[in-house]
């Protein structure tokens, strides 16, 4: 929940879908590292919801990795639960609903957005969504590129996918030795106990896919469109629908885990089939880990432009006076405050809430700040966001 919000404020709801985790205690409900994003995302005035997925958090089920239906349902159920608790906890929804998430969370965000528009538009109308670096086209882009190469950066993901889907569908294999060679067929099930990390599982698995997957299996799958694996993959593609609300995907071109063409395929299909406000943003030649920060922040900033703001109680009586900062993004390390007295005092705060420096007057100097997102916080006039570019 955002802090200092006036009791009379109804607030927009942002559902953040988390990325791939193997350890149950890494789920948002345990306030894991990714769970901390909720504090940041709520600061502009959002009620932030961060669902655990089936098999994670306190659940002891096997997690059906990148399973669209259960991902979407986890988001819907948490929205419903938050709505039911609103009166007791003293908050209310303003009728705006947003969705975002990175990596697996990008897939889950797309699945949730589709579900909201398809089946809940009269109850929880989606305002905008920002899926980030997600495998939207599992059956095509993602698996084809994995199997066209001799190795994959995270073979644990592939094992997670197969074992997780089989826990739900039950028809991908009868015995894991049909899919994986020994000793992995015997050793892998025990590693997906909700306690092992991605690093531990990846270190256990071989570098080359030919040493992991049974010979001939890839050819068997690719040669049979009705193979259970292909059917499961197609059921969990999440891009073949036409969004009626703004949707923006973010990706990076050196992503070695979730191939960036997922976003391009999704964008092309949606626009060719009548979508009017679907786009994507290229974050440049970053790998999956380095892409996360810019993508998440970019998605947040983009969605904020669609949110109805509510005045908060901590900004002072003069907060309603209109003021702006320009240019924004800053140019050559400076920006200017317009619409406030020349004696105004301010602080520069980073996205963690840390005060970087303070000053007074209408010119704000960012020349010593690293590239990123900052906030100009005034004593009596409120807060404004500013982007700093080199």
Please report, for each region that a protein language model flagged, where it lies by residue:
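Residue-level detector of functionally pivotal "anchor" positions at catalytic/ligand-binding pockets or at interdomain
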Residues: 306-332, 339, 354-356
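Short, surface-exposed "cap/lid" segments of acyl-processing enzymes
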Residues: 5-40
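Accessory cap/linker subdomain of secreted extracellular hydrolases
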Residues: 132-240
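Alpha/beta-hydrolase active-site loop
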Residues: 65-87
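C-terminal tail/sorting-segment detector
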Residues: 371-390
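C-terminal catalytic histidine-bearing segment of alpha/beta-hydrolase fold enzymes
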Residues: 143, 230-231, 257, 264-265, ...
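Short beta-strand/loop motif that positions the catalytic acidic residue
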Residues: 248-255
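Primarily recognizes the serine-hydrolase "nucleophile elbow" in alpha/beta-hydrolase
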Residues: 81-152
């Amino acid at each position: 929940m955002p802090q200092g919000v006036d009791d009379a404020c109804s607030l927009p709801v942002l559902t953040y879908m988390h990325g791939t985790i193997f350890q149950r205690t890494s789920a948002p409900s345990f306030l894991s590292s990714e769970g901390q994003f909720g504090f940041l995302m709520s600061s502009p005035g959002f009620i932030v919801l961060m669902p655990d997925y089936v098999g994670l958090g306190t659940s002891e089920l096997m997690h059906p990795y990148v399973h669209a239906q259960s991902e979407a349902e986890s988001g819907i159920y948490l929205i419903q639960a938050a709505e039911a608790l609103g009166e007791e906890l003293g908050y209310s929804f303003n009728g705006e609903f947003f969705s975002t998430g990175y990596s697996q969370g990008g897939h889950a965000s797309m699945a949730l957005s589709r579900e909201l528009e398809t089946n809940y538009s009269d109850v929880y109308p989606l305002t905008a969504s920002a899926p980030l670096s997600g495998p939207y086209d599992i059956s095509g882009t993602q698996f084809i590129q994995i199997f066209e190469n001799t190795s994959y950066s995270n073979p644990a993901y592939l094992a997670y996918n197969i074992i997780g889907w089989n826990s739900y569908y039950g028809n991908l294999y009868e015995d894991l030795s049909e899919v994986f060679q020994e000793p992995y067929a015997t050793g892998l099930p025990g590693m997906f106990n909700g306690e092992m990390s991605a690093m531990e599982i990846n270190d256990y698995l071989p570098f080359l896919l030919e040493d992991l997957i049974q010979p001939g299996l890839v050819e068997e799958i690719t040669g049979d469109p009705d193979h259970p694996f292909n059917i499961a993959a197609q059921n969990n593609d999440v891009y073949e629908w036409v969004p009626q609300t703004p949707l923006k995907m973010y990706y990076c071109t050196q992503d070695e885990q979730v191939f960036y063409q997922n976003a391009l395929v999704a964008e092309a299909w949606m626009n060719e089939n009548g979508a009017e406000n679907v786009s994507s943003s290229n974050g440049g030649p970053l790998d999956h880990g380095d892409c996360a920060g810019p993508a998440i922040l970019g998605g947040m900033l983009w969605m904020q432009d669609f949110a109805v703001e509510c005045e908060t109680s901590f900004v002072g009586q003069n907060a309603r006076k209109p003021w702006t900062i320009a240019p924004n993004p800053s140019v050559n390390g400076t920006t200017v405050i317009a619409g406030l007295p020349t004696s105004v005092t301010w602080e520069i705060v980073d996205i963690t809430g840390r005060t970087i420096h303070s000053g007074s007057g209408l010119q704000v100097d960012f020349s010593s700040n690293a590239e990123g997102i900052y906030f100009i916080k005034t004593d009596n006039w409120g807060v404004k966001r500013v982007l700093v570019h080199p």
